């Protein structure tokens, strides 16, 4: 079950994966907007200000790493949590988290349904963690 009214920006250059994940996340209750490359991702993120961004690392035009750094450097998007999507089996978790990612998710082409369910659960966990931090900061 999605965090109520959560807007997700899905940045994925593979049309198949973009459409499949958009469908699965919409079915899980998220409002999904998409981008197919790094340039489009930066524009959409700035224009739509999603609650969370799912960012593929291997993108045309601008790499996911550059997009992540640009998002974190922009005051309008700096506080939007980013979940990095990667198909790389050996992820440098410390480097990704140090660059500002809230989490990473290893894409699996073997079982897209289970992968989409795990992705939705990861999104919910990150959004809940951000909401808890925001609520604690507001009370302080």
Describe the role of every protein-language-model region.
Residues 1-7, 114-140:
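Non-catalytic signal-transmission and effector/linker regions of two-component phosphorelay proteins
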Residues 60, 69, 78:
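The feature encodes the CheY-like receiver
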Residues 12:
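Conserved acidic carboxylate
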Residues 48-54, 59:
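Active-site beta3 strand of CheY-like receiver
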Residues 37-40, 63-69:
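Acidic catalytic/metal-coordinating carboxylates
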Residues 66, 88-124:
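Alpha4 helix (beta4-alpha4-beta5 surface) of REC/receiver domains from two-component response regulators
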